[in-house]
Regions:
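Alpha-helix C-cap/termination motif
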Residues: 84, 134-135
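Short, charged, amphipathic alpha-helix that recurs within catalytic cores of restriction-modification
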Residues: 121-134
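Accessory nucleic acid-recognition modules appended to NTPase machines
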Residues: 1-108
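Short beta-strand-loop-alpha-helix junction that forms the active-site gateway
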Residues: 105, 111-120
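Domain-level recognition of nuclease-like catalytic cores that cleave nucleotide substrates
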Residues: 146-170
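Nucleic-acid nuclease catalytic cores
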Residues: 93, 135-154
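Short active-site-adjacent structural elements
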Residues: 98, 117-120, 149-153
Length: 170
């Protein structure tokens, strides 16, 4: 949220208002340095203030990251999906968070560096199964760094695919 970002910037010692943060984000979007996604599940008023932001280039994002691996992975997926689906691309957050949701393609996508940890595996797959209960989703996908498998859970199929293979297919 804008307030959260204002608080983060304020911790650096800079005095900045929420309105200034909103202006800067609008300028950055207007100059194509990054783009935003709306929460598909949000009410109309919240769609403006509750967005996720992605850099248009992973090189720019890499300048600001301390631990870049997962963020870079999610950002490259966002860039690729944005090119393909443009304004049809959303994220979904309502009791669960799904990284990317494309209602017209009936596709829900999670991005995770690895599913080797059981807690991560459960979080990512449960979110996909939950969105499939409330939305018309036919394809459930987890994009990872280098893992590949098909998970059968609750009568649904979740495809796990490495980023390199997914990028070649899109």
């Amino acid at each position: 949220s804008f307030n959260r970002l204002t608080n983060i910037v304020s911790t650096t010692g800079a005095k900045v208002s929420t309105d200034t943060i909103i202006d800067y984000l609008n300028f950055l979007q207007a100059t194509w340095l990054f783009f935003s996604l709306e929460n598909y599940a949000s009410k109309l008023v919240e769609k403006i203030s509750n967005r996720k932001y992605y850099f248009i280039d992973n090189g720019l994002l890499n300048l600001f990251l301390i631990d870049p691996v997962t963020s870079l992975l999610e950002n490259i997926v966002a860039i690729s999906l944005k090119k393909k689906y443009e304004e049809e691309l959303y994220f979904y957050q309502q009791n669960i968070e799904v990284d990317f949701y494309i209602p017209t393609a009936k596709l829900a996508v999670q991005v995770s560096y690895s599913l080797k940890e059981e807690s991560t595996r459960k979080r990512e797959t449960d979110a996909l199964l939950k969105i499939a209960e409330t939305q018309a989703v036919e394809t459930l996908l987890v994009i990872t760094y280098d893992e590949e498998e098909t998970i059968q859970k609750n009568g649904m199929e979740i495809k796990v695919i490495p980023i390199w293979k997914w990028l070649l297919d899109t």
